[in-house]
Amino acid sequence: CHVDDIYRLAVFGNHSPTMFPDLENTIVNGKNAYESINDHSWVEKEFLPKIQQRGAEIIEARGASSASSAARAACDTVKAVEHPTRSGDVFNAAIMSDGSYGIPAGIFSGFPLLSDGSGNIEIVRDYNLSEFAKSKIAITANELLEEKDLVKDLI
């Protein structure tokens, strides 16, 4: 599998242990990623925690900040906004929520997005989410609300 074979992968939330990479709407090699994995328990108990802890693992392995990863993500986001999203795909970035997917309006969260290539982006709203996915998104949304509350005196 090559990265170009992956479509519609969205990560909801923030770069933290509560972020939620949605496999239920992800397409790999033309097939639904979640349905292609026979062991859904593995997804929930091993894959998701591994992804959620990846940032901490990188910091531990490097013995330093993951600032270079953040810089790369920023560059990738600028490129995604400057070019039209490929047909049938999305790109992922954190933007201010409008209430989509149960993430309260006014907080920044990762969403599946489309770009027209002229700097205009929009949230893709056609993802069907299971109760499991909704519960994971609620956890990350609550974390973001708590973080917003912690800095409310600064904004």
Task: Place the predicted regions along the sequence by residue.
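C-terminal substrate-binding/catalytic lobe of Rossmann-fold NAD(P)-dependent dehydrogenases
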Residues: C1-I155
